[in-house]
Amino acid sequence: MSSLPALDIFLSDYQQAYLDTLGEHPRYYAQQQASECIVGDVDVETEEALQWKSVVRVDTGRFDNVEHALELSLHGDINAFYGSHFAASLMFDSQWGTGELLQAWSQSDFEHLQQNMIGHLMMKKKLKQEPTWFIGVFDDEDKMITVNNADGSVWIEIAGQAQSVKLADSLNSFISEVSPRVAPPVKLVEEVIPAYDHPGIWQRMKIMWRNLLGK
């Protein structure tokens, strides 16, 4: 079990919700990216959405390299949230709306996530704003879900702006307040985002960042 028990519970409930509702594991358009999460002996090169289930990592993924690169100490929850499992993005319902929580699909995806996190933190520094790190997005407009690096609280954040609406005092509390959303996988057509990027959620975040840089 990770140091975020609510995440362990959510991941278990997520799988069960799909099994109970659809009679199968959740599906994900992996875009030819191999992962330990893939269920069954299938061709990863397929264009079809693949069934998946979360996998506990043998060695916890850590963000020490990000801390070293930025000379910044990150809140410990970042390692527990991103480094304890491999999984696809997690769709949720909540009192604040529907959205997705980001997870690492594989080790290569985890490393790509670290690079995106460096970009986000560098942007915050450039804007002279307090450091935050993202965990997901809401479906409503351009609202990111970010963690305040100083105290671990969870907020709504619009790209280019400081955190605006506090959602929970801690990441564990926030995850406890959201519930799995059973929905078909969405295959996004990526015209300007490289194929190796994390499907879907990365596209949305990068569009937000690019719009900001263009201002």
Curated annotation (Swiss-Prot):
Protein keywords: Cell inner membrane, Cell membrane, Membrane
Record carries keyword Cell inner membrane: yes
The keyword Cell membrane is annotated on this UniProt entry: yes
Cellular component terms per the entry's GO annotation: cytoplasmic side of plasma membrane
Compartment list: Cell inner membrane
Membrane topology: Peripheral membrane protein
Cross-referenced InterPro entries: Syd, Syd_sf
Signal peptide, first to last residue: none
CDD domains, alphabetized: Syd
Family to which the UniProt record says this protein belongs: Belongs to the Syd family.
Role of this protein: Interacts with the SecY protein in vivo. May bind preferentially to an uncomplexed state of SecY, thus functioning either as a chelating agent for excess SecY in the cell or as a regulatory factor that negatively controls the translocase function.
Protein's name in the database: Protein Syd
